Amino acid sequence: MAEEQVLNTHNASLLLSAANKSHYPEDDIPEIALAGRSNVGKSSFINTLLGRKNLARTSGKPGKTQLLNFFNIDDKIRFVDVPGYGYAKVSKVERARWGKMIEEYLTSRDNLRAVVSLVDLRHEPSTEDVQMYEFLKYYEIPVIVVATKADKIPRGKWNKHESMIKKKLNFEQEDAFILFSSVDRIGIDQAWDAILEQI
């Protein structure tokens, strides 16, 4: 999609929630998946990019997203919010089910164009963060790393934290890396540019 202005980002809605591929939308609209740990800020990322307060529900309780949530944006693109990983209070059986559901979507969905992998700028990436990045690289799925909660760290320390994250992920320079804050509205244009480049 060459021009961002042809996309009315405010014309967005939750289309459906799916547990497996029999429930996926049947069309060829390109999709961008959003992956990250529970409470990394996926819902806030979606709401901020789409200029909506509560389109994706934010929750103080991690593990709230239990299905693949498909958000329709102007009938031209979809965001797919996948269950957050790394939430300790979810049973092993449930975590395994989520993992299978996410893997099935990421490896078999023709509509998928890229994955936004969200990490917390404040902390070193978790084992699950690293595994997700390695998984996407292995399957040659384009990845956009978004480091959230940049407002929680003084700007003078951003470079240090970015370097820490890139080193832990074994980050490849061809991938986009974006510092983001839904509070201070940092990184919105950069995120859209990286997403639309993949459509």
Swiss-Prot record:
Quick one: a GO cellular component term? cytosol
Domain of life here?
A: Bacteria
Which residues are involved in binding GTP?
Answer: 36-43, 63-67, 81-84, 148-151, 180-182
Q: Where are the transmembrane segments?
A: none
Q: Which cofactor does it need?
A: Mg(2+)
Q: Domain EngB-type G: where?
A: 28-199
List the molecular function annotations (GO) for this entry: GTP binding; metal ion binding
Question: InterPro entries in the record, alphabetically?
Answer: G_ENGB_dom (IPR030393), GTP-bd (IPR006073), GTP-bd_ribosome_bio_YsxC (IPR019987), P-loop_NTPase (IPR027417), Small_GTP-bd (IPR005225)
Q: Which CDD domains match?
A: YihA_EngB
Which of UniProt's keywords are assigned here?
Answer: Cell cycle, Cell division, GTP-binding, Magnesium, Metal-binding, Nucleotide-binding, Septation
- Matching Pfam families, A to Z? MMR_HSR1
SUPFAM superfamilies, from UniProt? P-loop containing nucleoside triphosphate hydrolases
Q: What does this protein do?
A: Necessary for normal cell division and for the maintenance of normal septation.
Q: What is stated as this protein's family in its record?
A: Belongs to the TRAFAC class TrmE-Era-EngA-EngB-Septin-like GTPase superfamily. EngB GTPase family.
Name used for this protein in its record: Probable GTP-binding protein EngB
Q: Which organism is it from?
A: Streptococcus uberis (strain ATCC BAA-854 / 0140J)
